[in-house]
Amino acid sequence: MTQPENNAIRDLVIVGGGTAGWMMAAAAARVLAGGVRRITLIESDAIGTVGVGEATIPPIHGFNELLGIEEQEFLDATKGTFKLAIQFENWGQVGERYFHPFGKTGRDFDGIAFHQLWSWLRDREGVGPLEDYSMSAVAARNGRFARPDANPRSPLSNLVYAYHFDATLYAAFLRDYAIERGVVRVEGRIVDVELDGESGHVSSVGLEDGASIPGDLFIDCSGFRSLLLGDALGVGFNDWSHWLPCDRALAVPSASDEQIAPFTNSHAHGAGWQWRIPLQHRTGNGHVYASAFMDHDEAERLLMANLKTPPLGECRPLRFQTGVRERLWDRNVVALGLAGGFLEPLESTSIHLIQTGIAKLLALF
């Protein structure tokens, strides 16, 4: 690898687009403006991305604020909706539902945490569910939404929210943002990775058309392929499937509901669970399941039988392996998103894990 004598990072190369790649590109363009010579992102239109409807958690606000993105512009571009909570259905008993809300639940009393007080009273007084004391959960249950009130005395000041949005549209939105700020997009399929003979660092990547893209630091956003960290550098994979056996998913869009719910729905099935993510223009649905305990046909039957609105297409199958690379940073390659690992997004944390990785990396510059 050719690198300046002071070891400064001048050429940053991002391999792969999608949500992870364009989040990295947009954040780097914003934070490293003037600090690096060139930011290049390589992607191929011939290689698809996993992109489905995405649900997030509240720290996504921090990422948008970092980029200086206006909320309404973001929602319009991504067909986004508001999210106050996750509703879990059938996870305890069949027919049982409960909310995992964002924000505060109740109020601490005389140094006693509210959930401890609630637990004590429940055993003695028969008080209602914990979610009854969360403004976010009560609003979500009633299909209502409001932005938090700035007045701390208002009950609405306890509202905390995140978003649902179309992942493909989100990547396109961030792509335009990044390119406007100087990121160079290169269209092409990577067919070769050149390693430095002495250090073992990645010195360049070769494209199908013969072009060679050199760099000082490479960000692997190539998805499950893990083209640089896994394939080129040989970093091993810690398989977690003995703990988390789900290894398949089916995804299908359906029509938008007349009443857009301000929450993500997670519905437990016999060998997995089903998500429902409401967007402006459609509803994202999917069934994550363990193929050792359920076959494809049964998984698809359950998914389609539990759609709330008519399907807009065919089921798309996905295969995955739960786990993480032994190292997410090896030599001059850092992996983000699926290139580094995968955990089924039961708590809507996929994008948050990307965001956290980006923040930790950029803090080192």
Briefly describe each language-model feature range.
Residues 29-52:
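Glycine-rich FAD pyrophosphate-binding loop
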Residues 48-140:
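Dinucleotide-binding Rossmann-like beta1-alpha1 core, especially the glycine-rich loop
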Residues 98-192:
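Conserved N-terminal helical subregion
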Residues 152-303, 358:
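Predominantly flavin-linked oxidoreductase catalytic cores and closely associated redox partners
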Residues 280, 289-365:
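FAD/FMN-dependent oxidoreductases across multiple families
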